[in-house]
Regions:
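Bacterial N-terminal signal peptides
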Residues: 17-29
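Short beta-strand->alpha-helix linker/helix-N-cap micro-motif
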Residues: 38, 53-127, 139-148, 167-168, ...
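Catalytic-center loop of serine/cysteine hydrolases
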Residues: 43-51, 108-113, 117-217
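Pro/Ala/Gly-rich low-complexity, hydrophilic intrinsically disordered segments
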Residues: 34-60, 183-222, 229, 248-307, ...
Length: 317
């Protein structure tokens, strides 16, 4: 009995350590500079637009920007997936050593400065210029659809910014309850198109889901959106709700700790740790995905690349 209690206590502190480590990644890694759009990010966006005509495309650096996806299902309850899917892809792609990923807050600040509103949805004709402003070699975005044969169908386009060519249109489909599988399918399709060679360690790490709990993920996505709108108290509540639903969701923990570090949250850090302890003592989740993910690909041969319009054919609704 004493041994079991010791293991529980040990696991508790290990999880707290992992949460702090995840927050440190947000600070140290350029793609993890936090999820709060700061005055510095908005100032950068203003300067980028002011220098729009003088910005030169950087060569040689494998930089990718992930745009918000557009919900075209007609179901407003799926709107959190617009930023949520982009957040998940950015989180995963940022762990690939051969890639540099544009920070989500930088992308969001630029979208708002361009007058695209909180949704940050980019028209197809503006995509190449957006990529140049973000200093990206590649840019990916797309639509969230609902089809007869697939409750959720993700149709995206990967653009080579300097050449203004579509490299391919990776897709993924599934049900909302298995949204983590949909994101992983899309992720590996994008990586294949980029012709990035993954190490075995990277592949194993990328296969781990952010969360198996879709309700927790939706709360995380709602929190990010509320934070973008400057509604930090609501964001705090959504982060707490996400943590209660999935005590292993370190992204929600890190984002909540960021709000606290910036004095945007009403909850103190020690109160948050008490919350984590309470839910983790009652929670046990796996960190592996369900085997047998279905991969959907629609690759375009290098010699047959099409000019960029991003108005690519989409299966009939």
């Amino acid at each position: 009995m004493l041994h079991i209690k010791f293991l529980k206590l040990k696991n508790h502190y290990v999880r707290i350590f992992m949460s702090v480590l995840f927050l440190a990644m947000f600070i140290s890694n350029s793609a993890f500079c936090g999820q709060v759009i700061t005055d510095e990010a908005r100032q950068w966006a203003k300067q980028a637009l002011a220098q729009e005509h003088t910005i030169q495309q950087t060569d040689g650096k494998k930089t990718i920007a992930v745009l918000n996806f557009e919900n075209k299902t007609g179901m407003a309850e799926l709107n959190p997936l617009q930023k949520g899917l982009a957040f998940m892809l950015i989180t995963d792609l940022s762990t690939v050593r051969d890639l540099h990923v544009v920070e989500r807050v930088k992308m969001q600040a630029l979208m708002e400065e361009m007058g695209l509103g909180q949704s940050g949805l980019v028209e197809s004709g503006d995509t190449p210029e957006t990529g140049r402003l973000l200093g990206a070699k590649w840019i990916v975005g797309g639509d969230i659809l609902a089809l007869a044969q697939a409750p959720l169908y993700i149709h995206s386009s990967l653009l080579d910014v300097p050449d203004e060519q579509v490299l391919g249109q990776p897709t993924a489909e599934g049900i909302l309850d298995n949204f983590f599988e949909i994101e992983k399918t899309l992720l590996f399709n994008i990586i294949d198109l980029l012709k990035v060679e993954l190490t075995q360690e990277e592949r194993i790490r990328l296969e781990r889901p952010l969360s198996l709990n879709t309700k927790a993920l939706l709360d995380l996505f709602k929190a990010i959106d509320a934070s973008d709108e400057g509604n930090y108290e609501q964001a705090e509540q959504y982060y707490k709700s996400a943590i209660k639903k999935d005590a292993q969701l370190t992204a929600a923990e890190a984002n909540l700790m960021e709000l606290q570090s910036l004095d945007f949250a009403s909850t103190r850090a020690n109160e948050s740790l008490q919350l984590l302890q309470a839910v983790r003592d009652q929670t046990s989740l796996t960190d592996t995905t369900v085997p047998g993910l279905t991969t959907k690909r629609n690759l375009i041969p290098e010699g047959n690349r099409i000019p960029i319009t991003l108005d690519v054919p989409v299966p009939a609704l």
